[in-house]
Structures are given as C-alpha cells and as structure tokens.
Amino acid sequence: MVMIKSLVFDKDGVLLDLIETWLPVMQGLAEYTLSLVPANAGRAVSRAMLLSSVGINDHTGRVDPNGLFARGSFFEIRAVWQTLLPAGMINLQEDETYRSEVKKIVRELGRGNAVAKGDLLTPLTQLSDAGFKLAVLTNDSEGSARQGLEEVGIAHLFEPIIGADSGHGGKPDPRGLLHCCALHGSAPAETLMI
C-alpha cells in the first residue's frame, strides 16, 4: 500500500475564500482595463461584459464555478478580455505598462483582503507535525499567493509555494505538481493534490 507523504494544496477556494479575497480585485482590474478603451472606439464594452466573460455576474456578484475567474489564470482572462476590446488597442498580454499597472492594482486591492476558509492554522500545523510535506500550487502569481498566505498566517507551513509564473506552467500542466514531488522527495503516487 502506498503511503501519502506530500500534500499539495490549491489556494483559491481551498485555503482562501475566492470571492471574498478576489472579487474586489477583479472588479478593479475590469475598471482599469475599461478605462483604456477610447470613447470613440466604436465598440461598446462594459465592466459587466468583461466580468461576465470570465464567469462573474457584475449585478449579483455570483461566480460561475467553471468560469475563468474560478478556474483560470490571469493570462487566460487577459486573452478573453482582448477579444472584447476594440481592434487596435494595446495587447493586454504584451503591453508592459498595462501589466505593471495590473500588478500594482492587485497589490493595492489585494493587500490585507485575504480571507481564510475557516481555521487553517490548526489542521495544517497538525499535518506538518505529523510529517506531511505541504505545498501550494496555484494559477495565481507566486508573489500574490505568498502575500495572501502570509496575511492569514500560514505561508510558513508551505514549501514550495508555486504560482503560474514560477516557471512550471499553470494548472492543469503537471510540471508544478511534479516539481513539488521532486522537492519533497515523494513520488506522484505518494502525493495528494487538494
């Protein structure tokens, strides 16, 4: 019988409350993106359209659990938003000014807003004390993930914390999980993804 040695956690929706933590940030990013659309662009784009395209109902705040907001990366969200913007606008994937401003908005609106999914410190400490190796694998950026986990007081329990920008691809690409296995000295069959 194979024994589990390594526990690799997703962050949003598992450790942190996705909606409480990230909905205000996503609304701010939609507002910023919308502010770049020229008034004479000839194509109507609204905050509700941008948010709806990634699975957020702007009027009710409800989130589609299968939408990009819940399951994707910001790389994927930018790609969808690009299709809604007028032709000739900046490339949301490549424009360094846009990407820099997005990082600033995420830091400002996300700082201090991480909401844990209940008491995490006690059970995670018990798992660590029992000898399990703990890691986080998320489609968020590594820096943002670390910030949120630090805010709720549990970052010190995880090694590594891997984001979509950590060089292993975003989920469901298996490279991040395999990297966790290698660092923990555990085989994939000895690893549980939560």
Question: What residues fall within each predicted segment?
Answer:
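A general structural motif
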Residues: 2-4, 131, 188-190
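N-terminal helical cap/lid subdomain that shapes the substrate entry/recognition surface
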Residues: 4-121, 130, 146
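Substrate-recognition "cap/lid" segment bordering the active-site pocket of phosphatases
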Residues: 108-116, 135, 140-193
